[in-house]
Regions:
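Inter-helix linker motif
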Residues: 368-382
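Short, amphipathic alpha-helical "recognition" segments used to contact nucleic acids or chromatin
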Residues: 163-174
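RNase H-like nuclease fold core
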Residues: 187-190, 194, 199-355, 359, ...
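Mobile genetic element proteins and their domesticated derivatives, centered on retroelements
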Residues: 22, 43, 50, 107, ...
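Short, charged amphipathic recognition helices of the HTH superfamily
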Residues: 173-184
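Acidic/histidine-rich catalytic cores and adjacent linkers
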Residues: 305-329, 348-366, 394-549
Length: 549
């Protein structure tokens, strides 16, 4: 009945407007019905559970059903590229050569030797390398002292650097579970129980924690902009969050108990002691947060530009702003901490974040660039029931991604005139009124984010999406699916450290296995990841637009 409906075919303007309103009302009814049906089924399942029964089972039907709605925008964003398979054996290092002889009895009398035909075969050895160290021992009667030779670097305890390296790489790099790591080691002939495997993965990792700190500091210094995202991580059954900070040269992980603005600042400052300042910038943030005018005037009398620690700041609030509510106190502390972060001269300060529009990411940096892919997902979530509205949505989504493609082209060749044109086209595109109410409301919300979505026009080196951080979050999700979550804060720190080193090594083209083995064996022949980040940063110049501004 509604398949052939086209509002443009209705000549009477009032009738056309009335039909449009009725269609939007029908969409609202359909959306409410879907939500009510889902809630009813959830309540039925809960009632059955309370009765000791089971909820409605999920049984796949015999007849094919339409696939669930895909919220990904890969198809719209991607342009097909030609692909050809290259030879891999030409670049392989040869570990050994083996001459395969021909049985002379199989050759005719006139056969003449013509050299060799080379065939490269890849293989790997997985076997034990148990070493009996016979340490020389001397005794000095005059000194009453016994002198014993030390073990080579990397050998400490029952297990050598090979086992330690393999366990760490399998658990953190290959995302294997702890029991499976132990099972694989035992299948290779290693006599090891579950407890020592856990200790190898978590205990005595101070050197790697130090390397992670260096990686993060180098990463923050490598560009004035950073990606940021978060995902959940339970520690010993308690809710927590993992923050992912990255750019093209590194990825760093931080597990915390909260994800508010103060916690995000803790992450960006690498958990150093919090600092606060009462200045004009902080007052502006407090006013924007919604603090009452009376409280704002009280704060204005405290402006002194002096950096304070948390104890001093809390004492100041208790003395001059007594009775401040918990939410108001959080607003004030966050504003003062952000102002102190911007005034910091002792470490790298992130000037722009590429992220989604979560409220805890706002105010922290001078500029904010929103993810276009995340914004596009909002349109994919619209589920119009009326074919006419479906057509309107499809047509606008095509225009949305066509504009996105123009922004991608601008990144490659940024021209001031093109930036002006793209700004005008953005304003035209997101001033569209389709008549489909849900779509028009979403378009208006996108238009309100213009400055953050068009940040690429001022800084062409930043990506248009937050995929690098989201990919980092997916790695934590996979780790969480396999291992559920760390049981201790020491374990959570080990997760953060080794996932940081594994992801960063991959971005820098460094073998994570060889890197871990190099450090555990004590050879330290490979350069540090932090040094590599610094070298690559000079080559890439990830802050070019800031250097010229």
């Amino acid at each position: 009945m509604l398949e052939d409906l086209d509002l443009h075919s209705i000549t009477d303007e009032q009738a056309r407007e009335l039909v449009g309103r009725l269609l939007n009302l029908l969409e609202d009814v359909q959306a409410d019905l879907r939500a009510a049906q889902a809630e009813i089924q959830r309540l039925r399942n809960e009632i059955n559970r309370l009765k000791g029964e089971q909820g409605q089972p999920t049984i796949k039907p015999n007849t094919p059903q339409p696939p669930p709605k895909d919220l990904s925008s890969e198809q719209e964003r991607r342009t097909p590229k030609a692909w050809s398979k290259g030879r891999k054996t030409d670049r392989l290092p040869i570990d050994r050569e083996h001459v395969v002889a021909v049985d002379l009895a199989d050759l005719p009398p006139d056969a003449v030797f013509k050299g060799y035909e080379d065939v490269v075969v890849q293989d790997v050895l997985f076997r034990t390398d148990n070493v009996l160290f016979r340490k020389e021992k001397f005794y000095s009667p005059s000194q009453h002292t016994t002198y014993v030779a030390s073990l080579p670097p990397g050998y400490r305890g029952q297990f050598g650097p090979g086992i330690k390296s393999l366990a760490l790489v399998l658990y953190y790099g290959a995302q294997m579970s702890e029991p499976k790591v132990a099972e694989l080691l035992r299948s290779g002939g290693v006599r090891i129980s579950d407890g020592p495997v856990s200790n190898l993965l978590i205990k005595d990792q101070a050197a790697f924690h130090t390397e992670k700190e260096a990686v993060y500091q180098a990463g923050l210094a490598s560009s004035p902009w950073q990606h940021l995202d978060d995902t959940s991580t339970r520690v010993n059954g308690h809710n927590g969050y993992c923050h992912i900070v990255c750019n093209p040269l590194y990825t760093a992980y931080f597990t915390t108990t909260a994800k508010d603005r103060l916690t995000v600042l803790d992450v960006l400052t690498n958990s150093r002691p919090r600092r606060f300042v009462v200045n004009a910038e902080a007052l502006g943030y407090v006013e924007a947060s919604g603090l009452s005018a009376v409280r704002c005037r009280q704060l204005a009398q405290l402006v002194d530009e002096v950096i304070m620690d948390e104890a001093q700041m809390q004492a100041l609030l208790e003395t001059h702003l007594p009775g401040l509510g918990p939410q108001q106190r959080k607003w004030v502390l966050a504003a003062m901490a952000v102002a102190a972060y911007h005034a910091d001269v002792g470490g790298p300060v992130v000037r722009l974040l590429v992220c989604d529009d979560a409220p805890q990411f706002t105010m922290i940096t001078e500029e904010l660039a929103l993810c276009w892919v995340h914004e596009g997902r909002h349109y994919k979530k619209l589920m119009p029931s009326i074919p006419y509205h479906q057509g309107l949505l499809e047509a606008f989504v095509q225009r949305f991604w066509a504009y996105y493609a123009q922004l991608l082209a601008y990144r490659k060749q940024p021209i001031p005139e093109e930036a002006i044109r793209l700004t005008e086209e953005f304003e035209t595109l997101f001033a569209t009124v389709t008549g489909y109410q849900a779509l028009d409301e979403r378009i208006a919300k996108t238009r309100a984010k213009q400055s953050c979505l068009l940040m690429v026009l001022a800084h062409p080196e930043i990506p248009l999406h937050n995929n690098p951080a989201e990919l980092g979050a997916r790695a934590r999700v996979r780790k969480r699916d396999v291992s559920f979550g760390p049981r201790t804060h020491e374990g959570a720190r080990a997760w953060d450290t080794f996932m940081t080193l594994a992801a960063t090594a991959t971005k820098l083209g460094v073998s994570f296995y060889h890197y871990i083995q190099d450090r555990l064996s004590g050879t330290s022949q490979m350069p540090s990841l932090a040094d590599l980040i610094g070298e690559r940063a000079k080559m890439l110049n990830l802050g070019a637009s800031w250097d010229t501004s």
